[in-house]
């Protein structure tokens, strides 16, 4: 099988969904902007050579509907001969796009793929038009469709206290702010035009969502968001609502060499698993274990992890059961995570993979693992190896 390599990985800044920087920018434009950026950064690649475009998006309606992958590629003026498909595995959509493209390359059906994802949660809210089948309640708890309550369940099962959650969430904002000041995001963020609070066109090259003033004390003052009486999960310990897109350029190792393009990493293994919807946030544990097994590696072999922070209450049980509690500050989400940066659903999989690759290069390490929980009980993981 062909080795699959990552040639490039970029993202937009993350904008606040409520009246944020991208309130007047459509999801297709965020996507097309990145598609154009990837091509301009890799001039030796003729856009007509792209075999397929895989683009993650969850709420595929309104501006995100009718195959946003194709709409965005047309906006980006990619040749009409290049096909495009929109992928939906809820929170794991753009990582699933990565997996789909990688498999096509592995078996020789493709040599070049552009992947990524987008979600404009300000324009198309997460629960827009959702209508669960009433028959689901025969086999699945009704609360399993409410992500915050699944996080509450995990917190209770794993004895994750409110204090632990507040500390983890504060760390996310502090790390993300420190990474911004240090310029660690510069290599992955493509400056993107939006509007400031006064409506003036502004070029954003930083994440608007991060709240550097966040402290454990300020988080402790927040009320539980999902279980007002007995709950511990607050808005402050949940992933922020944000708008954004991310993209990666995948190639067979042979094609990258032929084009004179430097491979940043290869995909070592991939995995997707299912789990009980009531504890959907636990999905990264079995997914990571399966991906590691397929890679012939152990948790100890992995130098850096990116775990999508849907909630502090679900991240901490995953970290605990992967045996990484003592390694958080050395190995996990070094630049913060979704609690600070937000979780634009269709964007996050390739966003965390992009951040992981940059951290692997900055720290000069060999192996990295990106993993996410997925609504309704799934987990997805990818192991990367630098080349």
Curated annotation (Swiss-Prot):
| Record lineage | Bacteria, Pseudomonadati, Pseudomonadota, Gammaproteobacteria, Enterobacterales
Tell whether Lipid metabolism is among the UniProt keywords. Answer: yes
CDD domains membership? thiolase
HAMAP family documented for this protein: FadA
Q: What is this protein called?
A: 3-ketoacyl-CoA thiolase
EC category: transferase
Q: Which GO terms describe its biological process?
A: fatty acid beta-oxidation; phenylacetate catabolic process
Q: EC number(s) of the enzyme?
A: 2.3.1.16
**Where is the protein found, in the record's own terms?**
Cytoplasm
Q: What does this protein do?
A: Catalyzes the final step of fatty acid oxidation in which acetyl-CoA is released and the CoA ester of a fatty acid two carbons shorter is formed.
The record ties this protein, via InterPro entries, to:
FadA, Thiolase, Thiolase-like, Thiolase-like_sf_Thiolase, Thiolase_acyl_enz_int_AS, Thiolase_AS, Thiolase_C, Thiolase_CS
Keywords per UniProt: Acyltransferase, Cytoplasm, Fatty acid metabolism, Lipid degradation, Lipid metabolism, Transferase
Q: Where is the active site?
A: 91, 343, 373
NCBIfam families xrefs: AcCoA-C-Actrans, fadA, PRK08947.1
